[in-house]
Amino acid sequence: MRHKKEIVKIGEHTCILHSEENAKFFITQPVDNNDTEELERQITYIEDNSQAPFIHIAIRINRWNAELTPWPAPPVFGKIPFGDGAHSTLLYIIDQLIPALKARFALELNKSNTILGGYSLAGLFSLWAGYQQNVPFRGIVSASPSAWYTGWLDYANSHQPQVE
């Protein structure tokens, strides 16, 4: 693996950084403990299939059902209801994470080189973030997003995506 791995605390979140010299793209991904077990394999796969140098930032989400969902909803699996923390998570990425990464790597993170992605509820969060005004992302990647989430389809049909 050509990326250097670091675990750092940025604000209230632990972040797992995989960085390389001369990075041109920044991939931000909210993750839970299960996702962190797959990160090495994921980074290796991207390295093997892309020539573009990149930095991958995994943000460990502490309360999965609360921090990634844009509005409250009753529990679907188990007993934990969904919250409305997506707004706060997006503000964390914009106001704390991105400035910290700019300072750490002395590189320009901007709308032309920053990608947000996620799996499951993090995929839903990524899709939702792509509909928000003035987001600093060029693109959104969403694998198996939780599009079943209460109200999501109505929201997506009544709003316009703001990313390319």
Enumerate the predicted regions with their spans.
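Non-catalytic cap/lid and distal C-terminal segments of serine-dependent acyl enzymes
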Residues: 1-164
